[in-house]
């Protein structure tokens, strides 16, 4: 297992996303310490059949402040299952289909280091 510093130096990490029909995909997630929470490409959300969490969040981006739907996402990282609440966004033109925000990244690392 890599420690927090190694992931931050690399700036990204592999995350397995588990979908509604036990489908999964491994994505390269960008660690973004400037983002509070995580975001996932809406095409992946639809393909993996993630359901909306019936919540939304105001998100500040380069395009201004928008309201995005939130989705409960099942992931596997460091050989352990986790659940994240992510916002959906069109990331089709971006290098990374997932942004792992600071709070979620620290939560994942904290859980891994406790075990």
Model regions and ranges:
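Pepsin/retropepsin-fold aspartyl endopeptidases
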Residues: 1-115
